[in-house]
Amino acid sequence: MGRSLKKGPFIADSLLKKVEKQNSNDDRSVIKTWSRASTILPVMIGHTIAVHNGKSHIPVFITEQMVGHKLGEFAPTRTYKGHIKDKKGAR
């Protein structure tokens, strides 16, 4: 179930302020954020936002196709190292 339309999309206030400040100054430096739950808005297109994955910040360049998705979708939190091929060969 999605979020109610009358509430609007969730975005952290601090993140929105940083994006709007950079838009007014024509600055495109990387913005660090821990807010993985924030929705990507059209105002963010062209910015690089470093999203925290629990260990480090992953830089994510925002494009038009990402609008409406969450920032956390583009910064994976788990690493998959593959299955062990053969336990007998390891001995």
Swiss-Prot record:
The alphabetized UniProt keywords are: Ribonucleoprotein, Ribosomal protein, RNA-binding, rRNA-binding
MF terms (GO), sorted A to Z: rRNA binding; structural constituent of ribosome
Q: Name one GO biological process term.
A: ribosomal small subunit assembly
Top-rank lineage group of the source organism: Bacteria
* Pfam families hit by this protein: Ribosomal_S19
GO CC annotation: cytoplasm; small ribosomal subunit
Q: Quote the function comment for this protein.
A: Protein S19 forms a complex with S13 that binds strongly to the 16S ribosomal RNA.
Q: What does the similarity note say?
A: Belongs to the universal ribosomal protein uS19 family.
**What's the protein name?**
Small ribosomal subunit protein uS19
Organism this protein belongs to: Prochlorococcus marinus (strain MIT 9211)
Gene name of the record: rpsS
